[in-house]
Amino acid sequence: MLSYRHSFHAGNHADVLKHIVQSLILNSLQQKEKPFIYHDTHSGVGRYDLTHEWSEKTGEYKQGIARVWQQDNIPAELDSYLDAIRQLNQGETLRYYPGSPRVARAHLREQDRMVLTELHPSDYPLLEQEFHRDRQVSIYKEDGFARLKASLPPQERRGLVLIDPPYEQAKEYGDVVRAIAHSYKRWATGIYAIWYPVVNRCDIDDMLEGLQGLEIRKILQIELGVAPDTNERGMTASGMIVINPPWTLESQMQTILPFLKQAIAPATGHYKVEWVVPE
C-alpha cells in the first residue's frame, strides 16, 4: 500500500518529537572527527510547504511545530533542530518544514554521507529534486527495509538508521522487528531510531516485546502524547525507540519533554523516557 502522504501531517507533534531526537543523535555523532552515515528507510519528499492545501486541510502543524515556534525560553537542547528549520525559512516566518532527510542534511559535515529510500512514485521525484547533484546523498526508489538489508554493514563504523514506516498495515510492526534483528547482526555499532504512532497501544506493546526478545542491550523508549490512549480512531501519541542511544540522550529528553508537553498539550499531554532494555 502506498496511500500514505506525509504532506497532510508534516510538522505535527509526532514530527516534532521524531526530528528533535534525530537532531540530538546526529549532534552526538558530530562530536568525533571520524565520518558517520545517516540511513533513512522512509524518506518522504525532504521538505514540506505548510501553506499547501494538504497541510492546511488537516492543520496538524498548528498543534505541533507552530506552537513550539512561538515559545519563549526554548531549551538550548533544541537549537540544532530549530536551526534546521530556519535554514528553509527566511526570518521568523514559518512556511517550510524539513522532513527527516533535510534535518539530517543540516547536520552532515564534509566527511559524512546519507542514504535515502522512498518507494512512493509521486514522492520519489520530489526527493530526488530536493537533493539534485548533492554528492553526499544517495537516493533509492525501492523498499526501505530491502535497501537497509542490502546496505549493511556500511564502511563507516558510526551512524544513525532512522526507521519510520507509515504503519498502514499491521505487519509493519513485525517488519521493524525483523529489520532490527537482521541489521544489528550486521552492524552492532550503529544507532537505530524507530518512530512509532500510538493508535493501538497493543501494537506498540507487541513490537516492544519483539525487540526485547532479540537480546539486544541498550534500548531507550521516548514518548510524547497529546491525549490519553483511546480505542477511537486517531493517533494520541508517538514515540521513538532508540537502540545504542548516545549517553546524553536520556537526560536531554528529560529536559525537553516537559517543555514540549507544556507547549503542545498543556492540559492533556503526557510523556515518558524509560529503558526497555538497560545496558
Regions found by a protein language model. Give the residues of each.
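Class I S-adenosyl-L-methionine-dependent methyltransferase catalytic core
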Residues: M1-E279
